[in-house]
Amino acid sequence: MAFDAAMSTHEDLLATIRYVRDRTGDPNAWQTGLTPTEVTAVVTSTTRSEQLDAILRKIRQRHSNLYYPAPPDREQGDAARAIADAEAALAHQNSATAQLDLQVVSAILNAHLKTVEGGESLHELQQEIEAAVRIRSDLDTPAGARDFQRFLIGKLKDIREVVATASLDAASKSALMAAWTSLYDASKGDRGDADDRGPASVGSGGAPARGAGQQPELPTRAEPDCLLDSLLLEDPGLLADDLQVPGGTSAAIPSASSTPSLPNLGGATMPGGGATPALVPGVSAPGGLPLSGLLRGVGDEPELTDFDERGQEVRDPADYEHANEPDERRADDREGADEDAGLGKSESPPQAPTTVTLPNGETVTAASPQLAAAIKAAASGTPIADAFQQQGIAIPLPGTAVANPVDSARISAGDVGVFTATPLPLALAKLFWTARFNTSQPCEGQTF
């Protein structure tokens, strides 16, 4: 009888371990709260039934929520009330904006986890949405719905993080992906409306209007990191016909091996010692990084036509004649040449910078409409050489010798870098790495 009791206790213990493992998805969840000695006793066949009984009770007590489901807590009640409030307010409008707001709110607040993994990010997002719905009293107006949608657009990154890291059930994951896709589409339209209104705009918080020389104030947008793209690449089930990621993030992107080098590329040193592909002249880094010389006038850059058919920069023979003269004299000669060049170019004013929106949602600023058109075509899949040639911009051949090497401490946008791997413009390279490899491979080689 004692032997039968021991076997029965051991079988109950094994059944409890399997139950906890299946319900939590963690094969080691049953060990939570047990000492190393107790864990060893479970897998030892000579352990007495009294000790197994104590361990069994301890496991069941530790995971009591799996055996006795708790009643709906206050947070679930708050989520239900928030959804009801949003439905009541947004139902007064028969507009796409209101419907999208309700879709996003419902998808977030109705999301459920299979396990506790990633639950913190979901709960934090749900609490922020609940609080936003509670404090807003203008959701029943078109202006309030649009302003609330800007708030939701600012949560694109958080929604993406929840989808990528939280252990959601299938229905919640599909609903959140659909909401993210629709919200991403809406964010592109909202960006276009802001561009049409011009640079002088006042934010919803009553901030003063920006100056005429600054970019228009736009809604906060998710940063183009690779979490969501890697999620979509690893889980093809999320890319159903109705859940395609907008903006062409999966569009054809030119291969790095077939991409020619570009003129006036600046080099930047990576922490690992390599060099990264640098910016096209006049293209601003995403996020408004304060890089020097990014928005220099077109007249300040070397003419793209000042290269011979081999890609070598054409120089005035007088430059070689005065190569050994003192620095002051050469500086005076350059100033006189700049004044003469300025007189010759005064008839055509410099072209204004042009804003370009990349397929991943980032915005860069090109120094001229021609350069903007070339960047847009290259980002859409056109080979970079063809994209620049269509705009009349000549590109030096790969391997072109460096005529004027400069010290690495003086590198700025517009300088030429030499790499052992083919360089790309920073914005295009970032998109290429994000969509294809989810990692960046630094180029190695000498930087000038």
Curated annotation (Swiss-Prot):
Residues 187-198, 307-334 have a biased composition (Basic and acidic residues). Residues 243-261 have a biased composition (Low complexity). Residues 187-221, 243-270, 291-361 are annotated as: Disordered. Disulfide bonds: none annotated. Pfam families: DUF4226. Coiled coil: none annotated. To M.tuberculosis Rv0025 and Rv0739. This is Uncharacterized protein MT0029. It comes from Mycobacterium tuberculosis (strain CDC 1551 / Oshkosh).
